[in-house]
Amino acid sequence: MSRRREKTYAPGPEFLAAWPSGASGNRINGLGERATRKASPMFWHPADQHPFGAVQQIAGASCRRTPDAAAAFASAYNYPELSPVNPEPARRTGEEWAEMAKEFALTHDADLFGATTLKDHYIVDGYAIEDQPNVIMLGFSHDYEELKHVPGTAENGRGPAEVGRQYARCTRASYALADWIRRQGFNAKPFPGPRADALLLIPAAIDAGLGELGKHGSLINRTYGSNLRLAGVTTDMPLTTQQMEQFGADDFCLNCRICEDACPPDAISETKQWVRGEERWYVDFDKCIPFFAENAGCAICIAVCPWARPGIAENLLAKMTRRREAMARSRVVAALSDEAAR
């Protein structure tokens, strides 16, 4: 178990001067709203679409000050030109295309592959994704031995540099897959991080079977845990799609406080919150982002998550399975006892 850190963090004067007067990221994100709506443009979207442009600049500068991080992130913004769409599409079944796309992705930098149909709530308000009804989601695992050095400092940039390297993989892999799809005769558009765009990656990744939402607001995969970055590719290629997978991460988070206790600004809630019509895990933007911006992107919560440590996920899955089986047996015994008492 982690030791609960004393919450002594307070933003510095430069950050406080950059924070827009009266603005709340929680309000923009829809915290407390029980009606369903699309997500609004927010952090890492273009600065003219939300009030936190100056805060984004501080976050970028903080990260660039750490050794090697600037070069690592620069590769993430190297967007290659895509091939034109082949006017004569090849003929395959949806299952065949899905298998071929998966094989291509997993041999071109990606560690995980999933596909789902594009849903309206994946698309950020004010944006459009037209005539591309499917979404391919890709996952990229961190080198945990590097990631665990977050947050970065002026002396140690290993953690932020590792984040930058994985975002660079996101770019390479998503652009390579989109290019391959276009050469097969179908339209495709890549959506890598870290810049935000039209597509919300985590909801699409959950529906594509890549994992569950964790208490820390990041995806938890059954193999790599929270030790992941994501990229997406929208396309009109016909694909068989995957189902959501619930393997126990959500139940685990209900009874775990490690990321919650480790968060310096106390931004991670013990309970789920209502956000745009859904009760789910939510990280307090107004508490998180000051520390995130001043400390090279932070990432403490995913580094301390028990699911992130290599080799741990399998043991956690086995533990969760035993717990569910024990609870099922208890319910059967209770039902039999009630029946016998009648």
Predicted regions and their residues:
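Catalytic cores of enzyme domains
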Residues: 102, 111-326
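Iron-sulfur (Fe-S) cluster-binding modules
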Residues: 1-115, 125, 129-131, 303, ...
